[in-house]
Amino acid sequence: MKTHSDRKSGLHPRNRHQAPYDFDALCQRTPELQPFVFVNEHGTQTLDFADPAAVKALNKALLALHYGIAHWDLPAGYLCPPIPGRVDYLHRVADLLAESAGKVPTGKGVRVLDIGVGANCIYPLLGAREYGWRFVGSDIDPVSVKAATLLAKSNGLGSQIECRLQGKAGDIFQGIVAQRERFALTLCNPPFHASLAEASKGTERKLRNLGKEATAKPVLNFGGQKAELWCEGGEAAFLASMITQSKAFASQCLWFSSLVSKKENLPAAKQGLSRIGARQVRVLEMAQGNKISRVLAWSFQDEAASRQWWSPMAHDNA
């Protein structure tokens, strides 16, 4: 029997999700996925991607089968991320680190900060499993911090993933990064929308694309709390704030990075980076089928200093 969709074009070569989903293997590993799988009119196994319960069950199965993450769940109403795209971000920035390290750096000596870790803890879980990296995940929502901490511990990664509560709205690095703490990389999936109404419209658009009728009060089909989905000024404002605040931590992080969903937000972000004196700026394109997104990465170290970052002497005070 055929499985869902064609090959997912555009994914990173190391991405485990190049091929169509193997629903037989996924259901064998995670039987709770089985009720959501059906054969469509083309004779292809698939599921209803507009159904939050189906998407959540698929995520649990993918994480268990491909990454050995046996325990994964979410509090009701929290963001349920698409696994192939999230892990693609990690592979792209791993290659970026490899440019100065000489090879893709692995192991607990590579410290990564995930800004807005969310209740799903997805980047730390995937990064710890794929590359052995050590993570700090920050979030302004206490429920997310508690849930992410539980996920790390329940998968035997409690010593590798630490979640910290950001106590001050508006601060991104301050209050999270300690004075002498160093990170090879920061990650962020910033709030996309400028308001709840805009987030709801985005869900209606997704449902139309999936051939579904939008309800009078649309359910956010991938879930999401306020801090996960929207902020004042949307993605552009959050990105501008992150760029400005990163300057104060220029010597403590090799590469800062963020997903940028809206291409039109790039020019202003690049101008902001130029103003604060970023030495290196990169845009890493990502594609999954027809969906195009990108990672904006910047560093206050030049190429020579970036190579020096990985020398043992550079980590004496880490």
From Swiss-Prot:
InterPro entries: METTL16/RlmF, rRNA_lsu_MeTfrase_F, SAM-dependent_MTases_sf. GO terms for biological process: rRNA base methylation. It is found in: Cytoplasm. GO terms for molecular function: 23S rRNA (adenine(1618)-N(6))-methyltransferase activity. The keyword Transit peptide does not apply. The keyword Methyltransferase applies. It comes from the Bacteria. This is Ribosomal RNA large subunit methyltransferase F.
